[in-house]
């Protein structure tokens, strides 16, 4: 129940008529917000008593957008990604949703749902994580126990910025605050209207005047259901460390978002998680915790494959890169491919088959597969498994084949580790990986540009780049928040077309494959923020500075991608610009592919 929506306009009209003074106006507004919080909090605790605790499931990371179809069996088409988890309250229906949990201590964050493991927080060495359980209808429900938010929950005299909505969940404390607030209200209504007295009042009135323009704006957005606008206002409040405004907006947003609702509601649930984590300074700990868990069952390995089939983004990237490589080595007898994110090796299935059918006979193919050693659990083994699978496929296609696995981070790559040989045509592949490399804005090493210069020194025949078309690298928090919202909302909308909202795996796909990126973009800063996308224009500048020249994609590649999109929604758009391809949703570019030499 949003009492403030009704009380605030009524109170201000009474003030304008001279019926009550400004001091009383401020206290009435504050009282309505507090009462609204108390009602919602009691509702939450009555529900939370029924929550059981089990071990949390695992999420898959967006670093592994490849199908495991090397054995060409349906049971081996699973996409495998790095482990992570994402939880959010899921109501039985959007209209009946009641997620109005006012206190930070009661709010479910990713960190609070980290299973039975304990992950230390940056700002709290004694942090402990609670467990999470699933209800019988597979709705993710968790009971938070987040010590990282304790500074918002402790009502000590030294803390003057405590919000009435962010206090401790203890009943006695709430009753004491409510009694004091009622006494202040009674006193204020008996006093004359003195501006100085009003100006000396604390709480919402002191920080915002009677009702700030931001609050009016937010209330109007809430009344018309403008979820994007309310999310933006909450992000502004978080950036300004405006705890009272943030608390109130979080309580409203909890009633507006849903992991089973419209695309904007589903994305909003994860963006809200990111905002709460950022405010608690726990984003980096959450992100690390999401990456270090082990798989709990083979069914979790299917999520990326579902996304791979539902949307053409990754097929677009792989097929366009393979087309450029096939064109560049069409007359070569010895081909060496360096893949800077080999994952399952699924990208190379179609290329090996194409090379096996090449007129004049196949070339000798050697692949150097680089992958972060942390991802070995996703394959349930080391890179030798990738080599074995690709080797079997190459043998079936009559392609002489050799594989070398390099289990190291891209920031650790040196020339001597790549095994380059004279007389080989060299192709280098960067599939959705360079945006994870820190640049000059993060570290003096500037691994992003260093890696490009290193590759240029190898004199490759072709270098392929596939990246998300977004500007989140050096953008300040608020512009980055808006960019994240616009980019991922288009992705969520495209998923909505293919996977019904009652699809039993859709929530898992979005939580495990996309939410991790969203939380990292919003909650983390500095070296902890690994998602650092750049638009193609900036990548062009980097490649030019490293000494590369464009290698325009052929018309054959363009035709191949157009044929691919025929089996998907007509809302997908394909644009060729300056030798590069842009795949978008409703004319909003989401992913780009280009080649260099």
UniProtKB/Swiss-Prot annotation:
Residues 111-172 are annotated as: Disordered. GO terms for molecular function: DNA-binding transcription factor activity. PANTHER family: OSJNBA0084A10.13 PROTEIN-RELATED (PTHR31636). Belongs to the GRAS family. Keywords: Nucleus, Transcription, Transcription regulation. This is Scarecrow-like protein 5. Residues 426-520 are annotated as: PFYRE. It is found in: Nucleus. InterPro entries: TF_GRAS. Residues 385-417 are annotated as: Leucine repeat II (LRII).
């Amino acid at each position: 129940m949003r009492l403030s929506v009704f009380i605030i306009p009524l109170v201000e009209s009474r003030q304008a008529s001279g019926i009550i003074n400004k001091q009383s106006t401020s206290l009435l507004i504050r009282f309505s917000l507090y009462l609204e919080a108390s009602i919602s909090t009691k509702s939450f605790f009555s529900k939370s008593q029924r929550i059981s605790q089990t071990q949390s499931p695992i999420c898959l990371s967006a670093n592994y957008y490849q199908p495991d179809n090397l054995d060409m069996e349906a049971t081996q088409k699973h996409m495998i990604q790095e482990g992570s988890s994402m939880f959010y309250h899921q109501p039985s229906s959007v209209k009946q949703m009641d997620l109005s949990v006012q206190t930070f201590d009661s709010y479910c964050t990713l960190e609070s749902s980290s299973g039975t493991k304990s992950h230390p927080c940056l700002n709290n060495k004694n942090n402990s994580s609670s467990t999470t359980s699933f209800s019988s209808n597979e709705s993710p429900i968790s009971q938070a126990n987040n010590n990282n938010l304790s500074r918002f929950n402790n009502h000590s005299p030294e803390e003057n910025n405590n919000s009435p909505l962010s206090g401790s969940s203890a009943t006695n404390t709430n009753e004491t605050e409510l009694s004091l607030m009622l006494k202040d209200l009674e006193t204020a209504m008996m006093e004359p209207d003195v501006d100085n007295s009003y100006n000396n009042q604390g709480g919402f009135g002191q920080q915002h005047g009677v009702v700030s323009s931001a609050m009016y704006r937010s209330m109007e957005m809430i009344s018309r259901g403008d979820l994007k606008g309310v999310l933006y206002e909450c992000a502004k409040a978080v950036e300004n460390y405006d705890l009272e405004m943030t608390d109130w907006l979080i309580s409203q947003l909890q009633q507006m978002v849903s992991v089973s609702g419209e695309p904007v509601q589903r994305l909003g649930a994860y963006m809200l998680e990111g905002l709460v984590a950022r405010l608690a300074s726990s984003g980096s700990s959450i992100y690390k915790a999401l990456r270090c868990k082990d798989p709990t069952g083979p069914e979790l390995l299917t999520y990326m494959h579902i996304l791979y089939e539902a949307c053409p983004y990754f097929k677009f990237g792989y097929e366009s890169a393979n087309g450029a490589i096939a064109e560049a080595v069409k007359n070569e007898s010895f081909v060496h491919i360096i893949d800077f994110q080999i994952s399952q090796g699924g990208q190379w299935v179609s290329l090996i088959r194409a090379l096996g059918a090449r007129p004049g006979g196949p070339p000798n193919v050697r692949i150097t597969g680089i992958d972060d050693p942390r991802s070995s659990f996703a394959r349930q083994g080391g890179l030798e498994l990738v080599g074995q699978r690709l080797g079997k496929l190459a043998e079936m296609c009559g392609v002489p084949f050799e594989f070398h696995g390099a289990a190291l981070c891209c920031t650790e790559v040196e020339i001597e580790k790549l095994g380059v040989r004279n007389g080989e045509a060299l192709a280098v592949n960067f599939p959705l990986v360079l945006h994870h490399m820190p640049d000059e804005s993060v570290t003096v090493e500037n691994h992003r540009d260093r890696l490009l210069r290193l590759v240029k020194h190898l004199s490759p025949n072709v270098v392929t780049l596939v990246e998300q078309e977004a500007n989140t690298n050096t953008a300040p928090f608020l512009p980055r928040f808006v960019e994240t919202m616009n980019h991922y909302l288009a992705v969520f909308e495209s998923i909505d077309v293919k996977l019904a909202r009652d699809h039993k795996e859709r929530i898992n796909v979005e939580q495990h494959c996309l939410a991790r990126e969203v939380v990292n973009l919003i909650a983390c800063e500095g070296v902890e923020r690994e998602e650092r996308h750049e638009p193609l224009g900036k990548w062009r500048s980097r490649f030019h500075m490293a000494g590369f020249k464009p290698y325009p994609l052929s018309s054959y590649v363009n035709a191949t991608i157009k044929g691919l999109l025929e089996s998907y929604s007509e809302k997908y758009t394909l644009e060729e610009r300056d030798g590069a391809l842009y795949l978008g949703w409703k004319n909003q570019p989401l992913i780009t592919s280009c080649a260099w030499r």
